[in-house]
UniProtKB/Swiss-Prot annotation:
NCBIfam families: atpA, PRK13343.1
Organism field: Lactiplantibacillus plantarum (strain ATCC BAA-793 / NCIMB 8826 / WCFS1)
Name under which the protein is recorded: ATP synthase subunit alpha
Residues passing through the membrane, by range: none
UniProt cross-references to PANTHER family, sorted A to Z: ATP SYNTHASE SUBUNIT ALPHA, MITOCHONDRIAL (PTHR48082:SF2)
EC class (word): translocase
Length: 504
């Protein structure tokens, strides 16, 4: 077989014509130090603050410190495979997480990767985790109520859509339960909920997810979790990832409720990172920008103007206090950023008052504008009555004779405390709350024994649903109280058939 030189030259020409020179250009640096969730690299002179970098083993990092001869990097994943001398390259991107409807019902880590064993999340939409908060003209005032289903909150410290309301208290006082109940009450309210668990035990998060699943709340909830075994950078980034996922829905005109459980652990993780990066420590060894850490996160919660779709994101950050000290550094920072706080008192909790909300120390600075008129009219004097009861309660313990007016205040106060008690994971509809609070403030419970009040409430709801459903419908439709004659007539009719425990 003869080889023709023409064919060989034609093949060579063809290959030369199809040959393309593609240059792969990347700015790279060399790792000079790695350990404790951070790395340092030399040679990345043009790296930007917050830029994603890729290590030679595929793990990503984020630029935190820009110094004259190297950059400080937080490692977003397992840093065991990174060695001194490894190559690290710029990506030109900032950190983004997947967003959209595909995230609903899933449990993910702060990088948006699923950790629930239900397969990959099919979405192409992403959003940067750091995003500028809406400006003044892009917002509108809080005007719609966000019902938590908890009587003590909806009556005394109401929350509006777009508000930031802090839940603060010692460990084991029911902070998470209050937030989970608020999520459960958003069923059929056209709300998307995001629960961000920061440094919570995996077993605890699993229990919360099971509760949400069992009660049908995972149909509208995203869970973002960074456990205590995760590197500190992931605990630091978790709230921002959750905020980005919620913002996507807010920008599309939807309403979002986001819970950060809890920001104390995020501040601790950020302190750890800052100290390892050799940033100068300040009060309680926190870095100087720890206020900005939380303010830039919580300012992203907003009620957007109608021109931008009128969506909202309501934030419920949680802060854990030590021995009830709300004057510590992180608690005072977050109190000053938020629009009010719900203070949970350990003494009340252990004496059986649950939820253990301290009405005196709790406040809502904007939610009152969003409260429905029916709730406003029945809850108006409640806080004052409760405060005077707490004051008189301490005097009455001395056992001195009390006049009739003081005794009446004490009796009413005991019934207020009893009515505001509520079992966990059993939120009430707003019309039911209005009905029992109307009965309370109009004296219908004054003759009911304190031990009978829980039964009185449940039987009253059954009676109204069966015989006077129109009252509930009126409250829901008009947001106002029905005529007093109708309300009093229904409560008088129920009082005739209600039997005290002793009479049974």
């Amino acid at each position: 077989m003869s080889i023709k030189s023409e064919e060989i030259s034609a093949l060579i020409k063809q290959q030369l014509e199809s040959y393309q020179t593609e240059l792969s250009v990347a700015e790279t640096g060399t790792v000079t130090y790695v350990g404790d969730g951070i790395a340092r690299a030399h040679g990345l002179d043009n790296a930007l603050q917050g830029e994603l970098l890729e290590f030679s083993n595929g793990v990503y990092g984020m630029v935190q410190n820009l110094e004259s001869n190297d950059v400080g990097i937080v490692v977003l994943g397992d840093f065991d495979g990174i060695r001194e001398g490894d190559t690290v390259k710029r990506t030109g991107r900032i950190m983004e997480v997947p967003v959209g409807d595909a995230m609903i019902g899933r449990v993910v880590n702060p990088l948006g990767q699923p950790v629930d064993g239900l397969g990959e999340i099919k979405t192409t939409n992403t959003r940067p985790i750091e995003h500028k908060a809406p400006g003044i003209m892009q917002r509108q005032s809080v005007s719609e109520p966000l019902q938590t289903g908890i009587k003590a909150i909806d009556a005394l410290v109401p929350i509006g859509r777009g508000q930031r309301e802090l839940i603060i208290g010692d460990r084991k006082t029911g902070k998470t339960s209050v937030a989970i109940d608020a999520i459960l009450n958003q069923k059929d309210q056209d709300m998307i909920c995001v629960y961000v668990a920061i440094g919570q035990k995996d077993s605890t998060v699993r229990a919360q997810v099971e509760t949400l699943k069992k009660l049908g709340a995972m149909d509208y909830t995203i869970v973002v979790t960074a456990g205590p075994a995760e590197p500190a950078p992931l605990l630091y980034l978790a709230p921002y990832a959750g905020a980005a996922m919620g913002e996507e829905f807010m920008m599309n005109g939807k309403h979002v409720l986001i819970v950060y459980d809890d920001l104390s652990k995020q501040a601790t993780a950020y302190r750890e990172l800052s100290l390892i990066l050799r940033r100068p420590p300040g009060r309680e060894a926190y870095p100087g920008d720890v206020f900005y850490l939380h303010s830039r996160l919580l300012e992203r919660a907003a009620k957007l103007s109608d021109e931008l779709g009128g969506g909202s994101m309501t934030a419920l950050p949680i802060i854990e206090t030590q021995a009830g000290d709300i004057s510590a550094y992180i608690p005072t920072n977050v109190i000053s950023i938020t629009d009010g706080q719900i203070f949970l008192d350990s003494d009340s909790f252990y004496s059986g008052v649950r939820p253990a909300i301290d009405a005196g120390a709790s406040v809502s600075r904007v939610g009152g504008d969003a409260q429905i008129k029916a709730m406003k009219s029945v809850a108006g004097t409640l806080r004052l009555d409760l405060a005077s009861y707490r004051e008189l309660e301490s005097f009455s313990q001395f056992g001195s004779d009390l006049d009739a007016a003081t005794q009446a205040k004490l009796n009413r106060g005991q019934r207020i405390v009893e009515v505001l008690k509520q079992p966990v994971h059993s939120p009430l509809k707003v019309e039911e709350q209005v009905m029992i609070l109307y009965a309370l403030t109009n004296g219908y419970l004054d003759k009911v024994a304190v031990d009978d009040i829980a039964r009185y409430q449940s039987e009253l709801f059954e009676f109204i649903h069966a015989s006077h459903q129109d009252l509930f419908d009126t409250i829901l439709a008009t947001k106002k109280l029905p005529e007093a004659d109708k309300m009093n007539g229904a409560l008088d009719a129920f009082a005739e058939q209600f039997q005290p425990t002793a009479a049974k």
